């Protein structure tokens, strides 16, 4: 429809037309934007091979609007309201409210990638030591994470019921068939809870949010805590990198970018040092 309404010459896919179509939407995920780039490149190559004129965007094409989406970091107030809504949810399946309450808190308090949570095995949780073995990671590298005492207590309560309800399932958070829920299931619930804490905001005006934002919120909270204690963030980053399972320190350094500028200045953080460390595209958008 876009091309039919904007192309005055039906026999040519012009550069202007292609670039206009590739303008990235304000809330468009980077993956979707990159997918559109790939699609239009292949289409243009096909048209050229068929004898038509078509502009082929460069392999390393970037657009002024292609900056990675900035995560939506819940404020302390919003975070409290969010988990209140999670805890108030009802369902025909009495197990689901407990699962959601535990799963979302585990992502937030441990900084897990949503897919790491979905792939967690029951056998990888040590309720005695309060540690979790993460095996199905983004870069296929195992790591161990320690839970807070409060998170450990909540998870123990959850597991007590889970082991009775789904003794045959290998997953920590199983669906009714004992398999893992799809990522869209968690995303739909996350957006629903977020909308509930924004009752005065029209649905079409709600910011784009996703479960992954809880992981970003965790990292931001850790950095805030270090700054409050007067810690040297640059020296502490390797610890956060290891805990969160980042492949390189640059991806961890990018979280400093999410902190308020006035907080960084007040804490004496040398921003230019971190800018040199950061990748052009943050790892979480991969």
What is the predicted role of each segment?
Residues 1-286:
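Conserved catalytic core of the tyrosine transesterase superfamily
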């Amino acid at each position: 429809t876009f091309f039919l309404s904007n192309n005055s010459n039906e026999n040519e896919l012009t550069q202007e037309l292609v670039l206009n179509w590739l303008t990235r939407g304000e809330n468009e995920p980077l993956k979707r934007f990159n997918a559109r780039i790939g699609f239009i490149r292949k289409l243009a190559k096909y048209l050229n091979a068929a004898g038509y004129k078509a502009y082929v965007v460069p392999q390393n094409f970037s657009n002024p609007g292609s900056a990675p989406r900035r995560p939506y970091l819940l404020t302390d107030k919003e975070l409290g309201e969010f988990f209140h809504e999670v805890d108030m949810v009802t369902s025909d399946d009495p197990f689901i409210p407990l699962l959601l309450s535990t799963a979302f808190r585990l992502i937030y308090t441990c900084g897990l990638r949503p897919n790491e949570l979905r792939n967690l095995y029951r056998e990888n949780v040590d309720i005695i030591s309060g540690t979790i073995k993460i095996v199905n990671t983004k870069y296929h590298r195992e790591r161990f994470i320690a839970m807070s005492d409060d998170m450990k207590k909540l998870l123990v309560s959850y597991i007590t019921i889970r082991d009775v309800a789904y003794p045959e399932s290998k997953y920590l958070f199983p669906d009714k068939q004992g398999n893992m829920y799809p990522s869209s299931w968690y995303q739909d619930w996350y957006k629903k809870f977020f909308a509930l804490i924004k009752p005065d905001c029209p649905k079409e005006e709600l910011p784009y949010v996703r479960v992954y934002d809880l992981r970003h919120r965790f990292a931001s909270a850790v950095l805030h805590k270090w700054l409050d204690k007067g810690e040297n963030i640059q020296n502490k980053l390797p610890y956060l990198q290891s805990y969160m399972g980042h492949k390189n320190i640059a991806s961890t350094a990018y979280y400093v970018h999410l902190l308020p500028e006035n907080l960084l200045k007040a804490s004496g953080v040398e921003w230019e040092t971190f800018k040199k460390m950061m990748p052009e595209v943050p790892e979480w958008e991969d």
